[in-house]
Swiss-Prot record:
Known function: Aspartyl-tRNA synthetase with relaxed tRNA specificity since it is able to aspartylate not only its cognate tRNA(Asp) but also tRNA(Asn). Reaction proceeds in two steps: L-aspartate is first activated by ATP to form Asp-AMP and then transferred to the acceptor end of tRNA(Asp/Asn).
GO MF terms held by the record: aspartate-tRNA ligase activity; aspartate-tRNA(Asn) ligase activity; ATP binding; nucleic acid binding
SUPFAM superfamilies in the record: Class II aaRS and biotin synthetases, GAD domain-like, Nucleic acid-binding proteins
Parts forming coiled coils: none
Protein's name according to its UniProt entry: Aspartate--tRNA(Asp/Asn) ligase
Record gene name: aspS
Similarity comment: Belongs to the class-II aminoacyl-tRNA synthetase family. Type 1 subfamily.
Assembly behavior: Homodimer.
Catalyzed reactions per annotation: tRNA(Asx) + L-aspartate + ATP = L-aspartyl-tRNA(Asx) + AMP + diphosphate
InterPro entries assigned to the protein according to its UniProt record, in alphabetical order: Aa-tRNA-synt_II (IPR004364), aa-tRNA-synth_II (IPR006195), aa-tRNA-synth_II/BPL/LPL (IPR045864), Asp-tRNA-ligase_1 (IPR004524), Asp-tRNA-ligase_1_N (IPR047089), Asp/Asn-tRNA-synth_IIb (IPR002312), AspRS_core (IPR047090), GAD-like_sf (IPR004115)
One GO biological process term: aspartyl-tRNA aminoacylation
Amino acid sequence: MLKTHSCALTQENVGTEVTLAGWVHRRRDHGGVIFIDLRDREGIVQVIFNPEQSAACLDIGKELRSEYVLQVKGVVSHRPAGTENNRMPSGMVEVVAVNAKILNAAKTPPFYINEEVEVDESLRLKYRYLDIRRQGMKNNLIIRHKAVRFMREFLNDQGFIEIETPILIKSTPEGARDYLVPSRLFPGKFFALPQSPQQLKQLLMVAGMEKYYQVARCFRDEDLRADRQPEFTQLDMEMSFVDEEDMMKLMEDLFTGLVANVRPDMKYNKKFPRISFADAMEKYGCDKPDLRFGMELADITDIGASSAFGVFKNVAAQGGAIKAISAPGCGGYNKSQQEELINLAKKYGAAGLVPISLGVENGVLKDLTMEMVKSVAAKYLALEEIKTIAERSGAKPGDLILIVAGARKMVNTVLGEMRNQLAVKLNLCDKNELSFAFVVDFPLFQWDEEGKRWDSVHHPFTAPLESDMPLMDTDPGRVGSRAYDVVCNGYEIAGGSIRIHQADLQRKVFHLLGYNDEQIDERFGHLLEAFEFGAPPHGGVAPGIDRFVMLLAGETSIREVISFPKNQAAQDLLFGAPSVVDDKQIKDLHIRIQAEKE
């Protein structure tokens, strides 16, 4: 080894002769004595090049620049009194160099490595190997390593077996587009990269493995967001002879144990509340609510229906919904700020937004007067009606009530989005808190109005509630599913369900989704045949590793916790991928590139 110790030295190392190797983090010349901060993965330590100790070392010290790779030998000493640095773990000690060797020089980096400054993301991704040298990125990857290590150890202790499944599989589209791989040996035929190992892990249950997991790489050719990538990693799990309670207990223990092990400084709830899908949509406007703050959606349809406000009366008469949320402390918003909120509501599909300001002074609701109320709706609403709206939405004097009216689904979506965005704007979220919950009682199917057909809410392998089975023939939209999601801070971090394990029921679900028997046998025949050889009851779940590590690291994009991610256009800026390939490679695959028509 070219080093005997890491740079994470402490007072326990005083008097020890060490050989260190790393990168020059900073260099300072103090009148003939040169100080450098030497950095490796574990830490940073100050090294002194003093001519009284070694003139040759000083000459090398004069050559050093930021990011040079350096090996240095010396003795660990206490820093002189008054020169200690309490901001560094190694700030009480220094290394007096007696020998040094430049292992490699370095060009000037395109951005500062030694300062946590904002850098354009495209530049960071192009020079990702330099970006990872920065402390924030390095810490994120270490958190990821610790999280995955804990997951493996936890599941191993629970009797799970880690089994790898194929990356090249058959295309059986499950929602998003597949990434296709043309076969050279079978012209005109294609493999697909797995969107998840769903069918494979179910087949492992048929095979009698009972408890399976893997850290699975998955691929989806879909539009990107801050929390999505074309390739992503999930902790894939499946168990035989379990029900929902077993799986939810496993998830609760896994996530709480993981946080306690990897980020014990974070606040988190050890028991996960359970929220029905319907309640989540009605109270929070989405099926992955952020529970770190209130601002629940309040239904005021009855008040609007009996009020003198024509807009509200018409919506209520047509069977629509009228709902409100309270923006705390925003009663003083001016016309421009309120207009910004109105435009935000319109962006998400609302025809408009009705703000009601309860004045600028904080107070209690019983003291509210009409003189304090400012709104275009004020002349149509009585004071008692406004107080009731405020009471339901949790508003008080000094707050701003925001009301949306229209189709219930749209109202929930708009106010749910506004709730989340206002929480960020108003700093209502504790970044050091993880608020877990289970979302349950999902419907099995949802109606696709555009395609005029039923779709799976989760995926077609999710089992229906046994009590709802008769409804599959008469009213599929009312069939409940045995699905369970884990949500945290506004993200779905794990989705799971008890699976269908009977061939006839699975075929029936496929029929409801619009597949005919020929399509079913061609795409899923292998699974249905396996179910005929004694498939056990089974269930599973798949926590998204990228997304949960993002929350553990306090980041807002999964790109911050992936070593070499794609950008938001699904491009790899470091390697320049996707790229043009050699014509011979295309010919060998028996395919032809068709230029897009302008």
